[in-house]
Amino acid sequence: MIAVLKGKVLDKTLDSVVVDVNGIGFKVAVLPRELGSLNLNSEVVMYTSLQVREDGWFLYGFSDEETRKFFDLLLSVSGIGPKAALAILNEFTPEKLNWVIANKDEKALTKVPGVGKKNAQRLFLELKDKIGYTSFTSNEESVENFQDLWGDVYKGLLSLGLSAAEAREILGKIDKKSVKTPEEGIALALRFLNK
């Protein structure tokens, strides 16, 4: 499998680039939001997913490993193909998509072209146990505000040496409504850790 490409951008289209790696040109489909940063003759490192189908072999490239992992994860959901997976990842960063899935934000997910209500429900069902975050809220808070605050708290706990599972467990116990800043959230989480 081709996992990483490091080379020079030779050509660019509306949805792909050709990357020259030691004289071999690889055509790689990329996210539209990442296409603008890929300039001709620039050196790139792309984390890739090779998809083999009846009609050919296709490479999908991403600027980071986390996005590539999410692409493969989305493809594991029945009814989600590469086109829909790219559309979802073009709309959401992996971190934001974690929150959308954990909080079952159907409204946000169905705004993505090609993702209807059934696909959104299937994503929630099939990925709920595979994503990195746990749902920290049950109310209608916006994903952006909630993610910013609690994403920072989560990252802060990880940087303090907690495992992802420990951080999720502690965050699941915290009363979210009383916390206004990441610092308050981390302090409260550390109190739970010491109990």
UniProtKB/Swiss-Prot annotation:
CDD domains associated with the record: UBA_RuvA_C
Domain of life: Bacteria
Classification via Pfam families: HHH_5, RuvA_C, RuvA_N
Chain segments carrying region Domain I: 1-63
GO biological process, one term: DNA recombination
Compartment annotation: Cytoplasm
Classification via Gene3D superfamilies: 5' to 3' exonuclease, C-terminal subdomain, Nucleic acid-binding proteins
General function of this protein: The RuvA-RuvB-RuvC complex processes Holliday junction (HJ) DNA during genetic recombination and DNA repair, while the RuvA-RuvB complex plays an important role in the rescue of blocked DNA replication forks via replication fork reversal (RFR). RuvA specifically binds to HJ cruciform DNA, conferring on it an open structure. The RuvB hexamer acts as an ATP-dependent pump, pulling dsDNA into and through the RuvAB complex. HJ branch migration allows RuvC to scan DNA until it finds its consensus sequence, where it cleaves and resolves the cruciform DNA.
Family: Belongs to the RuvA family.
Protein known as: Holliday junction branch migration complex subunit RuvA
